[in-house]
């Protein structure tokens, strides 16, 4: 059994709204990346967000998935999805 198998994934409504505006091909890739988070939230092109406790961003192509890892509750909360621009961070 995987060490990360018991993580619960929660996705904010803002993320679902953002996904509707993204082209289908990119949307499918992003959804796959989000669904893989509970398998191992620390895998992939990750960077911890400065000034934020337990907040991370994962790079998926030209998009960024922002999420918080609540280690005690074993919850991953995806709270933002943005296309990478000079104003993303």
Give the predicted meaning of each segment.
Residues 1-9, 17, 21, 28, ...:
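Enriched for short, Lys/Arg-rich terminal
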Residues 12:
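PIN/NYN-family metal-dependent endoribonuclease catalytic core
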Residues 27, 31-34:
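Short, well-structured alpha-helical segments
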Residues 34-58:
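A short, surface-exposed loop/turn module that caps and links secondary-structure elements
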